[in-house]
Regions:
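N-terminal, polar/charged subdomain of small-to-medium soluble alpha/beta proteins
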Residues: 1-116
Length: 116
């Protein structure tokens, strides 16, 4: 079993339930973890035998560009797109962090995680 982690993919996006979030936007961080049988890549040293983290980053940015009201929805879309890109049995974990959400009080971030 192997584990690949792509941490702190930083994106500016326009998610949220408030109208001002659609206009002003906000900062997000996304962490992707994928685990599974990566022994072939360990032995071959060939990019086609592994999960290309450059492609992971592209998929995250593509999905983050599609506006959603909820980070739960964004996380599920990213998760689905990743699973569709790589058909082998892998376990994916997607963590979406919304920095400085517009709520009452001083809140640094809100996080949602989906995996499977």
């Amino acid at each position: 079993m192997g584990l690949i982690e792509v941490k702190d993919i930083r994106v500016f996006a326009y998610h949220g339930c408030l109208e001002e979030e659609a206009r002003i936007g906000g900062h997000y961080r996304i962490d992707i973890t994928v685990s599974g049988d990566l022994v072939r890549a360990e032995n071959s040293d060939d990019l086609t035998d592994t999960v290309d983290y450059g492609r992971i980053t592209s998929i995250v940015k593509e999905q983050m560009a599609i506006r959603s009201k909820l980070i739960e929805h964004v996380a599920r879309r990213i998760h689905t797109a990743l699973k569709e890109q790589w058909s082998q049995p892998l376990n994916w974990r997607v963590r979406v962090v919304k920095e400085r959400p517009p709520v009452q009080g001083d809140v640094a971030e809100v996080t949602y995680t989906v995996e499977g």
